[in-house]
């Protein structure tokens, strides 16, 4: 009833926006899309849902917190759904709007459409990424962000041992180790989600950690580590195995 009291003659739509990069915790409450749909239908106004980061795969089956998928929103009755082309979707930076044809057609006629539309290169890149989603297995395998967040801790640990061995064999002026850590997803939809992971640690002998971190960030292929307890942490979940030897070579220039 509280939501309906806000509807006036000039109300043209109901908009539900994902909190995206933050969460309000404690004694709080938020209206759901299921509650808004009948209100919108009763007053004959469209409902728009901004999902933040576009999620096309139910990530809860991989042990992550459930996030509403684009398909869920459409299935429940949202008239227009908008979301990002990058972030969890894994494509180029873009805004995507889907929904009922009559509303999409109105947007196409708006004068701002020409100014805000993406270029052909972005459209081509986005098309290739979306084609991966024709097979969930293929998307998980080929899109880096999905592959990283769904990789098992055992597999991450196995790769961490490999990176540790490569760095040790590079004879760096540092102590190389391994420690459990947590990967934080963020990405516009999962700001509080943390995944158990494994980090390779570097304790330099002849250079301070802040100085080493700075020089790592200025390499030709920047390495962005996490620092704590006078130690460099490389979260292996976020590193492709094909870069392990390159990382060892570049660190060899600094240590």
Question: Model regions: which residues?
Answer:
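Short glycine/threonine-rich loop-to-helix capping motif typified by GTGT followed
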Residues: 61-65, 154-155, 189-193, 238-244
């Amino acid at each position: 009833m509280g939501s309906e009291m806000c509807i006036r003659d000039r109300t043209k739509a109901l908009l539900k926006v994902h909190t995206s990069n933050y969460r309000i915790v404690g004694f709080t409450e938020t209206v759901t899309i299921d509650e808004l749909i009948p209100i919108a239908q009763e007053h004959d106004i469209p409902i728009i849902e901004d999902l933040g980061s576009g999620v096309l795969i139910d990530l809860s089956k991989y042990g992550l917190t459930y996030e509403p998928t684009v398909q869920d929103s459409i299935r429940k009755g949202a008239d227009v759904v908008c979301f990002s082309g990058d972030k969890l979707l894994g494509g180029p930076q873009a805004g995507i709007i889907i929904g009922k044809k009559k509303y999409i057609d109105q947007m196409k006629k708006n004068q701002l459409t020409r100014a805000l539309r993406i270029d052909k290169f972005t459209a081509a890149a986005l098309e290739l990424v979306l084609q991966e989603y024709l097979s969930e297995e293929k998307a998980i395998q080929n899109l880096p962000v999905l592959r990283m967040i769904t990789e098992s801790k055992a597999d991450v640990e196995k790769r961490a041992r490999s990176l540790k061995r490569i760095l040790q064999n590079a004879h760096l002026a540092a102590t190389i180790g391994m420690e459990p850590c947590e990967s934080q997803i963020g990405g516009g939809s999962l700001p509080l989600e943390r995944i158990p992971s494994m980090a390779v640690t570097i304790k330099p002998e002849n250079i301070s950690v802040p100085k080493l971190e700075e020089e790592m960030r200025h390499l030709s292929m920047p390495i962005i580590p996490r620092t704590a307890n006078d130690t460099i942490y490389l979260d292996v979940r976020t590193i492709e195995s094909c870069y392990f030897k390159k990382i060892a070579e570049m660190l060899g220039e600094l240590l």
